[in-house]
């Protein structure tokens, strides 16, 4: 065999010849053509995906816009549930039975002491923990009085008896109360031992609950005559206008982005056929692709070859493809495919979490996160950990896939959040998420969402002794059997906003908003991303804070504020123009105009956050789109 490299038959000594184009220069050119075709294919796919995402977002926002009416349909079942709950709140037999049960549990660890009977009236809290302004009387027929005629009386329950007492309540009490302490003009009474306690029907708190019940019942009767359709109040219409402004702002943003990506798609899509044709022709010439750069004089001196090399280099720089093996790995994964549906759902959920963190909440992932994902899918790496940063809101997140907890359990995802507060302190909090690819029938067999949550939170102790928040991702529509909130998402998802399950302790003792189940179903159009965004937004805004028994000078959060609607850190305090309340805080997002209200429960002082009807993760009142229920004591706010 004779090989001629000059490219002309006249240089051959033999009569027969067969031309070959499979030379290093052409092998490299074919590699460039094939790689460019792959890149263009991926870019076209990305453009199509973004077009679809922006179209879906526009469709979803238009649906929300169309749903804004000057009336709302009231959920009758939730009104009935509220009436049943309110009835128990002024039923002194029920209340006193609960008090007796609580007292027995407290006294197990205390030495029994001689007790005397008396009457105690609690008024508003003093501001100190477990203390109230008070009055007393020795017998039922006496008048209420101060302990000393010219002074004030304070009652301090101390920590162990705190759960028995409530502001604006009158009690008949048998207790051992030692000599009082003095604090200026005030006398401080505190029980050393309580042997019996019962609330009196004439208590202002009981009367108020009875009035609330009567008002709600009368409203319910009136609504039943109007097919449960209620006109919005002036305040509700004002809130709706704010939401409409936010939606229109987001519509404008997504319409602009959709137009931009449409231009990119229109420019790239026609490039596919020419590259496919060139690749086909080169392969017909029996040229084999090779990525090795041919450092030959032919390649260096030929401007056509040089143009191919420099053009490919510029293309990679333009799209940020520093490592070509990522592109090759993606092609291999595409060829392999995934047929294990639970595993596919699990990894799909992982990608949705990443998508919400990066696209909705604007976190920046570490540089090599794609390589880590690819290594996991290819089976080269089981556990992966990806860092996400958002310095604008002083938060960092470590997302782990299939990690081991300290107790040896292995959930699907763990998100460790580190936040720096406005005063420079650090907050550390963990969210554990497990993806369950269950059918509706199988979910029911497992005890519904309550059974699955209980198994993970308590049984497997994903909560690590109630230190972590634990949520389940599932694809089942209408998974919530006993809906407790009137929001649209409450049929499919449960965010721990109110007590729901038999295994939960009394509402004031449970870990509110620390566990739940969220519907992540791709068949829900773009709404499934909102479900995940609402869950993660709740954790990043509310879950990392200590919200219980909040008595701060302001209802604001310690961590840096951000917008749960668009993820922007450009939120401004507009409290002075919205409210004269010294504790309450109003924030408006400068990018999407979304309003966030920081307030607290008047009954138990739990901090509460309202994010408008659509994004609020706490339960709204059945007959109001602006008033919510406290997740801790379940009182209306």
From Swiss-Prot:
Optimum pH is 7.0. The keyword Hydrolase applies. It holds the Pfam family PDDEXK_7. InterPro entries: PDDEXK_7. It comes from the Bacteria. Keywords: Hydrolase, Serine esterase. Inhibited by Hg(2+), Ag(+) and rho-chloromercuribenzoate. Its EC number is 3.1.1.88. GO terms for molecular function: trans-permethrin hydrolase activity. It catalyses: (-)-trans-permethrin + H2O = (3-phenoxyphenyl)methanol + (1S,3R)-3-(2,2-dichlorovinyl)-2,2-dimethylcyclopropanecarboxylate + H(+). The keyword Transferase does not apply. Catalyzes the hydrolysis of pyrethroids pesticides. Hydrolyzes cis-permethrin at approximately equal rate to trans-permethrin. This is Pyrethroid hydrolase. It comes from Klebsiella sp. The gene is estP.
């Amino acid at each position: 065999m004779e090989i001629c490299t000059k490219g002309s038959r006249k240089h051959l000594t033999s009569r027969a010849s067969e031309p070959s184009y499979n030379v290093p220069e052409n092998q490299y050119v074919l590699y460039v053509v094939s790689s460019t075709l792959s890149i263009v294919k991926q870019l076209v796919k990305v453009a199509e995906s973004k077009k679809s995402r922006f179209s879906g977002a526009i469709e979803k926002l238009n649906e929300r816009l169309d749903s804004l009416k000057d009336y709302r349909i009231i959920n009758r079942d939730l009104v009935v549930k509220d009436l049943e709950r309110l009835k128990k709140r002024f039923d002194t037999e029920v209340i006193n039975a609960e008090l007796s049960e609580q007292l027995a549990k407290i006294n197990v660890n205390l030495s029994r002491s001689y007790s005397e009977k008396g009457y105690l009236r609690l008024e508003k809290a003093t501001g100190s923990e477990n203390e109230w302004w008070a009055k007393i009387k020795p017998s039922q027929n006496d008048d209420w009085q101060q302990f000393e005629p010219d002074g004030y009386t304070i009652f301090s329950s101390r920590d162990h008896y705190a759960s028995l007492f409530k502001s604006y309540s009158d009690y008949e009490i048998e207790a051992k109360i030692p000599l009082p302490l003095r604090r200026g003009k005030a006398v401080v009474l505190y029980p050393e031992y309580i042997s019996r306690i019962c609330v009196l029907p004439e208590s202002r708190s009981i009367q108020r609950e009875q009035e609330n019940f009567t008002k709600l019942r009368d409203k319910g009767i009136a609504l039943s005559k109007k097919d449960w359709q209620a006109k919005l109040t002036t305040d509700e219409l004002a809130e709706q206008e704010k939401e409409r402004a936010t939606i229109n702002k987001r519509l404008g943003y997504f319409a602009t982005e959709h137009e931009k990506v449409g231009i990119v798609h229109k420019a790239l899509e026609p490039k596919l056929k020419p590259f496919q044709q060139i690749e086909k022709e080169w392969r017909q010439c029996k040229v084999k692709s090779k990525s090795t750069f041919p450092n030959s004089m032919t390649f260096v001196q030929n401007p056509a070859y040089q143009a191919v090399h420099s053009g490919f280099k510029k293309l990679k720089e333009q799209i940020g493809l520093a490592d070509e093996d990522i592109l090759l790995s993606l092609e291999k994964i595409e060829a392999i495919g995934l047929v294990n549906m639970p595993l596919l759902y699990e990894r799909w959920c992982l990608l949705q979490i990443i998508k919400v963190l990066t696209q909705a909440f604007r976190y920046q992932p570490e540089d090599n996160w794609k390589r880590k994902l690819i290594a996991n899918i290819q089976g080269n790496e089981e556990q992966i950990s990806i860092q996400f940063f958002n310095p604008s809101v002083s938060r960092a997140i470590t997302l782990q896939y299939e990690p081991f907890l300290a107790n040896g359990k292995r959930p699907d995802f763990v998100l460790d959040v580190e936040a720096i507060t406005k005063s420079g302190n650090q907050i550390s909090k963990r969210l554990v998420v497990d993806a369950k690819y269950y059918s509706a029938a199988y979910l029911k067999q497992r005890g519904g969402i309550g059974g699955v949550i209980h198994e993970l939170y308590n049984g497997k102790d994903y909560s690590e002794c109630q230190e972590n928040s634990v949520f389940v991702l599932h694809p089942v529509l209408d998974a919530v059997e006993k809906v407790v909130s009137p929001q649209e998402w409450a049929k499919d998802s449960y965010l721990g906003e109110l007590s729901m399950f038999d295994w939960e302790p009394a509402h004031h003792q449970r870990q509110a908003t620390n566990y739940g189940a969220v519907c992540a179903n791709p068949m829900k159009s773009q709404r499934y991303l909102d479900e995940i965004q609402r869950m993660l937004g709740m954790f990043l805004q509310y879950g990392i804070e200590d919200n219980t028994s909040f008595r701060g000078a302001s209802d604001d959060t310690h961590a840096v504020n951000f917008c749960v609607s668009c993820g922007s850190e450009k939120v401004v305090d507009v409290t002075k123009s919205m409210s004269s309340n010294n504790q309450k805080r109003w924030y408006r997002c400068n990018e999407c105009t979304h309003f966030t209200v920081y307030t607290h429960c008047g009954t138990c002082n739990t901090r509460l956050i309202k994010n408008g009807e659509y994004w609020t993760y706490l339960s709204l009142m059945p007959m109001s789109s602006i008033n919510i229920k406290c997740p801790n004591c379940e009182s209306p706010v």
